[in-house]
Amino acid sequence: MDFKLTVLPGDGIGPEVMDEGLKVLNAVAKKYKHTFKYQYGLIGGCCIDKEGVALSPAALAMCKKSDAVLLAAVGDPRFDDPKLPVHPEDGLLALRKGLGLFANIRPVKVAPSLVNSTPIKAEIVKGTDFIFIRELTGGVYFAKPKKRWTTPAGIRKATDSMTYSENEIERIVRVGFELAKNRKKKLVSVDKANVLLSSRLWRQIVIEVAKDYPEVKVEHVLVDACAMKLILAPTYFDVIVTENLFGDILTDEASMLAGSMGMLPSASLAGIPAKGTKIFGLYEPIHGSAPTIAKQNIANPIATILSIAMMLRYSCGLETEAVEIESAVDKVLAAGYATIDIFKEGNTKLGTAEMGNQITKMIGG
């Protein structure tokens, strides 16, 4: 099969980890006789340097003509000053909005070989395997009104409003139900319905949509309680769905269960994934650009590689090939190979490129 992909390496360690991801994808393509055509674009700080914007209209148009988009990392400390008119992260928000990417899917799975690499006790994280679904294009991050001003008394004020429509809630909740019905048939919906009106609407919509999925057990959990339970009993969860802000915070918390943010992939989809469907999506590791370790060959490429596996599953309809990559990663980790972020005594320490080579070798490319 033939596929057209837009590749956005981005900032910091982005180009390095993307190289390893494409190395693995090329091995899969060779083994299964697929063709992936790559077209490259700029996003983030490197785009600001060249074009004055964090995402150019040309790059967005390129993405829209692709079967999927691969992104590595966005962020540059040179643009951290909040007074600057444009920031690298603006490109990511524009990409999500411009491509209609409303559903962020983040698997959190602890490899057996890494249970002692996390800050949580091994007996607690062992067996952790759940999926976070975060709404991406609504809520406080896309606030209207959103403003900052100074009062006549000289007091600085700012406001961001959290707004959700029932349509926005329903479509992301259906993503949760669709994934839950093909797993353990258990869905946890996270909100703050004891305080926020938007969360009360969220909970009401979840209850209504649940009628279409009688086989799925639904539980409503307040966001603060969820934050505690993720640490106390992560194996309790299977599929979690929540709004934008809560999801942003909770998914970073959950990343520590896996030992490193360098282990976790993500998919941002423009549709509801169901068996037999191909959904346009953006695929990226959850980690940042990590500029302090860029160009040192020490960044962990596994999150990018696993993001490519998710692309094969959701946007290309290639489940066997996706499992091939995931299995190769598991085997390499089980053999004791590790990048510096997950390294422990007894492991064989590898650099970025060397980890990519080992996973490629396991696939047979």
Swiss-Prot record:
It is found in: Cytoplasm. Mg(2+) binds at D224, D248, D252. It comes from the Bacteria. One of its GO terms (cellular component) is cytosol. It is an enzyme of class 1 (oxidoreductase). Pathway: Amino-acid biosynthesis; L-leucine biosynthesis; L-leucine from 3-methyl-2-oxobutanoate: step 3/4. Binds 1 Mg(2+) or Mn(2+) ion per subunit. It catalyses: (2R,3S)-3-isopropylmalate + NAD(+) = 4-methyl-2-oxopentanoate + CO2 + NADH. It holds the Pfam family Iso_dh. The record marks Y141, K192 as: Important for catalysis. Its cofactor is Mg(2+); Mn(2+). Keywords: Amino-acid biosynthesis, Branched-chain amino acid biosynthesis, Cytoplasm, Leucine biosynthesis, Magnesium, Manganese, Metal-binding, NAD, Oxidoreductase. Substrate binds at R96, R106, R134, D224. Belongs to the isocitrate and isopropylmalate dehydrogenases family. LeuB type 1 subfamily. NCBIfam families: leuB (TIGR00169). Homodimer. PANTHER family: 3-ISOPROPYLMALATE DEHYDROGENASE. This is 3-isopropylmalate dehydrogenase. It comes from Dehalococcoides mccartyi (strain CBDB1). The gene is leuB.
